Amino acid sequence: DKLTEEQTKALLSGLKKESEIRLTYGKTTLKVSDKGAAAAMLKMDEFQQRLNTPSALTRQGQEKHAVLAPKVEPQIDAVSVKNRKTTELKLGEKQYDNVLALLRKAHDGCVDEDLESQDITIYPLTHNKVLAEALCFKGAYQSTNYYAVLDDKLSKVEQVLAEQYNEAGYDEKQGYAFVRGSYKGHAFGDCWNGQDAVWNGKIFIRTSDWMTGGCYKWFTGGAWQLPTFVSDIIVK
C-alpha cells in the first residue's frame, strides 16, 4: 500500500525536525528512524539537484535552477504471437531425449536430477522459432526454469535464458510472449526480486528489473516494489 497524500505531507513535515515517527500496518507498528529517513530524503534532493529549491523534499529554498530531468523509458519492441498453443514433450519419448541433449549441450548449469524430472513445454513464437521450458533447479521454497529459444524443428538452440526466470506465457491482451522471474530473498517471502523479458521476433530482451528492498518478516510479499529498470513495450 502507498501512503496517502495527507500521510506523505505529515511524514515530510516530521522529517524537518526531531520527531518520533511510527508506521502501523494491520496489527504491526514499526518505528521509523527520523534521522535515517531525513538523510535519505536529503540524498534524493541532492541527486535530483533540488537542494534549496521550492520542489525539494526536506531542505527547501527559493533558488531557481534546472533540476535533473527524468530519463526517457527505453522502447522495447515485442511481437504478437498468433499461434499460442503449447505442446508437451513427455519424459521417455525420443523427441524429449533429443531436446534434453540439446539443452544440456547449450548450458550445463542445471541440476541433472531436476532437469530430467519433468516434461519439456514448447511455446510457439514467430519467425519459425519456439521457446523450450524445462525445470533447472528446485529448492525448498522456489524453483528456476531453463528457457531456450530453438528453431521450430527442435534441432538447434539459438538463445539460452537459463537460471533467470521461472514463468513463461503470452500477454492476455496483446499476445506477445514473455518470460518472468520472481524470487524470494528467504523462506518467509518478505523480500523479493525479479525481472521480465519479451520476444521481439529475434530474441528475448529484458523489459524490467525490480526488488522489494530489505527483508522484514512483517511484510509478506515485500514491503513495496522498487523498479531498477523499466521500459515501454511497443507491440508490433
Enumerate the predicted regions with their spans:
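Mid-length scaffold segments of soluble, non-membrane domains
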Residues: 1, 133, 137-163
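Internal interaction segment
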Residues: 1-102, 210-235
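Short, surface-exposed coil-to-beta transition loops
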Residues: 7-8, 142-146, 189-194
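Short, solvent-exposed coil/turn segments at beta-strand boundaries
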Residues: 16-18, 124-130, 152-154, 170-179, ...
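Surface-exposed loop/turn elements that mediate protein-protein interactions on large endomembrane-trafficking
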Residues: 96-109, 146-160, 197-205
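Signature of short aromatic-glycine-proline-rich micro-motifs recurring in repeat-based ectodomains
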Residues: 108-120
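Exposed beta-strand-loop-beta-strand "reactive/processing" segments of non-cytosolic proteins
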Residues: 120-139
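Short aromatic loop motif centered on NTY/YTY
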Residues: 158-236
